[in-house]
Amino acid sequence: WMQGWDYGFIFDSTVNDFVSGELEKSIVVCYKEKNPDFIIIEGQAALRNPSGPCGGEFLISCSVDGVVLQHSPKRKYYDGWEHVGALMPSLASEVALIEAYGRRVVAIALTTSKMSEKEMHGYKKSISKELNIPVFLPLEEGVLELAEILKKLRDDN
């Protein structure tokens, strides 16, 4: 019902009081009907996005086993909030915030818009070293290694 997907709901038009219940319902129905190996939950914005922070519901109500965090290293401000100087927090602090919710960041996927190949690989290497978390360039290198991480996470749980 949602552009070809059987499970989910329109997050942006759901009153916040009902978001957790809608998330839980979508996951339970999907699990009962399909019994999938994975349920991938596409996140929304960021935990500290000034236009509407969200994500806590996804982390807690969905009881996620791991987070693949999307990061845009060249972005300085939240999109659309440059005029008020809404700086993006550091990646390390975002990882720490997710961990404060009791969830683990299992990988980081980089948005490589406006980056040279040298910059892409430089960010990949430095972030992986700093945070000791696997970093991926999904558009440039694919996601096979990431899929292996997710399979291991599934098998360990």
Label each PLM-derived region with a short phrase.
Residues 1-157:
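Flexible phosphate-sensing "switch/lid" loops adjacent to ATP/NTP-binding sites
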